[in-house]
Amino acid sequence: QRQMCIRDSTKTFAMIADFFDITIPEENKVAVANGESLSLGAHQLTFVFAPMVHWPEVMVTYDAKDKVLFSADGFGKFGALDVEEEWDCEARRYYIGIVGKYGAQVQALLKKAAALDIAIICPLHGPALKDNLAHYINLYDIWSSYRAESEGVMIAYTSVYGHTKAAAQLPVSYTHLRAHETKANL
């Protein structure tokens, strides 16, 4: 009789063996297939592979009863859970730093997720998302397809004496563009 059973992808088990000094007995491992489901009585979990949404072995899990998508690194954000703050800014920073180079893989996951009736998204990092899910999914679609969130032009410059700053601001003075200056202290 087993005391513990780990369900994961074959790739995950291979990575554990390759990178860690851990031996999981074969009788405690159950490799799941993409789309495979597990009944836990009232809850039915479906495993959906999402390779390279940050890591090669990523898998998300969907609970059909409560309509919860456990999204791994997808839809995560930086920040503390006990601080009220807008999700978008820190989620954008998280996406760019952690998941951003895997846009095609995120797009593939979004297509798979579109077939699910999702009420809650629970990422590994950040708060559970319960309201206005279309907003979060739309932002992930924009970010992962490398489209601009809003129209604009960025002129990046550094200026010790102010001359480069004056030159960089010339295009703004001759157009209908509005200037927004952000200073970075390096």
Mark where each language-model region is.
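Short, flexible hinge/linker loops that cap or flank conserved catalytic cores
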Residues: 39, 62, 146-149
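Conserved small/polar residues in nucleotide/adenosyl-binding loops
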Residues: 2-8, 175-184
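N-terminal beta1-alpha1-beta2 submodule of the flavodoxin-like/Rossmannoid cofactor-binding fold
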Residues: 132-178
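Hydrophobic packing residues within well-ordered alpha-helices of enzyme cores
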Residues: 16-17, 164, 186
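Metallo-beta-lactamase
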Residues: 44-131
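Active-site HxH/HxHxD metal-binding segment of metal-dependent hydrolases
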Residues: 1-38
